[in-house]
From Swiss-Prot:
InterPro entries: PFD_beta-like, PFDN4, Prefoldin. The gene is pfdn4. It comes from Dictyostelium discoideum (Social amoeba). Binds specifically to cytosolic chaperonin (c-CPN) and transfers target proteins to it. Binds to nascent polypeptide chain and promotes folding in an environment in which there are many competing pathways for nonnative proteins. Belongs to the prefoldin subunit beta family. Pfam families: Prefoldin_2. Keywords: Chaperone. This is Probable prefoldin subunit 4. One of its GO terms (molecular function) is unfolded protein binding. Heterohexamer of two PFD-alpha type and four PFD-beta type subunits. One of its GO terms (biological process) is protein folding.
Length: 132
């Protein structure tokens, strides 16, 4: 073994992992999983928002006396143009609120990640990898 490799092994062996350290490492992992889950959820909601916006545009150019099928759960309701516009507007607003909430949650996780990285890298230096 080279001298630098031996030094690295010695450094790893010298740093003991206590229960509090392990809890922080586990928390980092759980937060990382949650962040990826939120990112997938955000992507799905953004796709739904795009579809809803397209539907809203289609309604705009439709005849006023037309009837539209609106999906509610597993059922379809036949509604007039005004009701359809109102329902889609409410749905779009809900999606936008959900996306803002997800963004806020992701930012909170990023802040906690930064805090944990500072603490854990200070103790374990290069013997721990907290990158995604």
């Amino acid at each position: 073994m080279s001298k630098t490799m031996i030094e690295k092994v010695d450094e790893v062996l010298e740093t003991e992992v206590c229960a509090a350290d392990q809890k922080m490492i586990n928390l980092f992992g759980r937060l990382n999983n949650r962040k990826h889950e939120l990112m997938r959820e955000k992507k799905a909601k953004q796709e739904d928002l795009e579809k809803a916006t397209d539907s809203q545009d289609d309604l705009f150019i439709a005849d006023d006396d037309s009837k539209f099928k609106y999906s509610m759960g597993e059922a379809f309701l036949e509604v007039n143009k005004e009701d359809a516009e109102s329902l889609i507007e409410k749905y779009i607003n809900k999606l936008e609120e959900d996306i803002k909430k997800i963004d806020s949650d992701i930012n909170d996780i990023n802040e906690k990640h930064k805090e944990l990285k500072v603490i854990l890298y200070a103790k374990f230096k290069n013997s721990i990898n907290l990158e995604e």
